From Swiss-Prot:
Modified residues (N6-(pyridoxal phosphate)lysine): K265
Stated name of the protein: Glutamate-1-semialdehyde 2,1-aminomutase
The species this protein was found in: Desulfatibacillum aliphaticivorans
EC numbers for this chain: 5.4.3.8
Catalytic activity: (S)-4-amino-5-oxopentanoate = 5-aminolevulinate
Gene3D superfamilies in UniProt: Aspartate Aminotransferase, domain 1 (3.90.1150.10), Type I PLP-dependent aspartate aminotransferase-like (Major domain) (3.40.640.10)
Principal place of residence: cytoplasm
GO biological process, one term: protoporphyrinogen IX biosynthetic process
Co-factor(s): pyridoxal 5'-phosphate
A molecular function GO annotation: glutamate-1-semialdehyde 2,1-aminomutase activity
Cellular localisation: Cytoplasm
Length: 425
């Protein structure tokens, strides 16, 4: 860690907090960050040359692992023709067609550069289409760092233990209501009073930014019914879950049809990307075909499109998700047993290849449950696992990601490390 410590000290002189995204600083787990030099398959290597089994996967995009040959080949082929043109390319159509063919509810799609851009644009579209201002989100759900969505948010906001962010005007925050996740009755009560003023309900169909929290069936289905009743646009934020928990995202897993879907991470194959899509009647309201404006200098850039196309081709192969499910289940079952054998109160929450080990005595169904977890114990667990060569998200409120590159040996080594560390807690 000597080189990483040197790099962190150097970074702090020119980069706020020494990192370009807060959770990476590892402050909540009482240690300094690892600076990474390279990755290969399921492994990453820090600046000192130490190898780790990686369960961050760049926070979700790397479902195929690091430097997958098909993705690298596609990026190199695109790069040979130029980085970006500021004009349409065929690759944009190819990726859009792939997304529309895979994602059940998406009839048209617009490419952007990040998940934050996708959610901000989807909110604007919902407001423009309905003529309403109100937004409903859920405590602990994170939808990027747009002003109107930084209310009772998860991810780094939860990790830092802050309710929102200075710099968000009260008038902006007032237009957003944050309700309890998995509580459909709270949504119904709210909409009785303000449903006719609400433009959109946005939700992570599987919460992944307060740790992994699965939706109750009556909650996710109930949102669709409430939105239909009041003419509200239902937005599923599938930036994390899209192409991750199932090929067709969480919407295919739970059988719910949103009006709009936001996407990112996996569809960029590790390059910066985002997208939002949905019903043709809504999407045609976006400029230049409609009055709702949205634009981006690097939107649809060739390298990200090429990486996304290659990734979607790989994950569409027969048996891909079955194999990923098997690895993820083996890891979850092993962690559950290791915690029980060590006498440590813990809950494993998993949907597909996303999972979290909560240091909690009972089930975690919402943000209040997540906040009751033993954060000190998680910090010790994180530090111990990192020392054993296992790279986990440095926050109790983040998801672990299993990739197709994780082997049986990787899972076995991870569980062996977990058994050792859990016994020491």
């Amino acid at each position: 860690m000597e080189k990483s410590k040197e790099l962190f000290a150097r970074a702090c002189k020119t980069i706020p907090g020494g990192v370009n995204s807060p959770v990476r600083a590892c402050g909540s787990v009482g240690t300094d960050p690892c600076f990474i030099a390279r990755g290969q398959g399921s492994a990453i290597f820090d600046a000192d040359g130490k190898q780790y089994i990686d369960y961050i996967g760049s926070w979700g995009p790397l479902i195929l692992g690091h430097r997958h040959p098909a993705v690298i080949k596609a990026i190199e082929a695109a790069l040979a023709n130029g980085c970006t043109f500021g004009a349409p390319t065929e690759l944009e159509i190819d990726l859009a067609e792939a997304v529309v063919n895979i994602m059940p509810s998406v009839e048209m799609v617009r490419m952007v550069n990040s998940g934050t851009e996708a959610t901000m644009s989807a909110i604007r579209l919902a407001r423009g289409a309905t003529g309403r201002d109100g937004i409903v989100k859920f405590d602990g759900c994170y939808h990027g760092h747009g002003d109107s969505l930084l209310v009772a948010a998860g991810s780094g906001v939860a990790t830092l233990g802050i309710p929102g962010s200075p710099g968000v005007p009260d008038k902006v925050a007032e237009s957003t209501a944050s309700l309890e996740y998995n509580n459909i009755e709270a949504v119904k009560e709210y909409c009785k009073k303000k449903g006719d003023r609400t433009a959109a309900i946005i939700v992570e169909p599987v919460a992944g930014n307060m740790g992994v929290v699965a939706p109750k069936p009556e909650f996710i289905q109930g949102l669709r019914e409430v939105c239909d009743q009041y003419g509200i646009v239902l937005i599923l934020d599938e930036v994390m879950t899209g192409f991750r928990v199932a090929l067709g995202g969480a919407q295919s897993l739970y059988g719910v049809t949103p009006d709009l879907t936001t996407m990112g991470k996996v569809i960029g194959g590790g390059l910066p990307v985002g997208a939002y899509g949905g019903k043709r009647s809504l999407m045609e309201k976006i400029a230049p075909s409609g009055p709702v404006y949205q634009a981006g200098t690097l939107s649809g850039n060739p390298m990200a499109m090429a990486a996304g196309i290659a990734t979607l081709k790989e994950i569409s192969a027969p048996g891909f998700y079955e194999a990923l499910e098997k690895s993820s289940q083996t890891l979850a079952d092993g962690l559950k047993k290791a915690a029980a054998d060590a006498g440590v109160e813990a809950v494993i929450s998993r949907v597909g290849s996303m999972q979290t080990l909560f240091f909690s005595a009972g089930p975690v169904e919402n943000f209040e449950d997540a906040k009751k977890c033993d954060l000190d114990r998680f910090s010790k667990f994180y530090q111990g696992m990192r020392a054993e060569g296992v790279f986990l998200p440095p926050s109790q409120f983040e998801a672990w990601f299993v990739s197709s590159a994780h082997t049986e040996a990787d899972i076995e080594a991870t569980l062996k490390a977990a058994e050792k560390v859990l016994r020491q807690l």
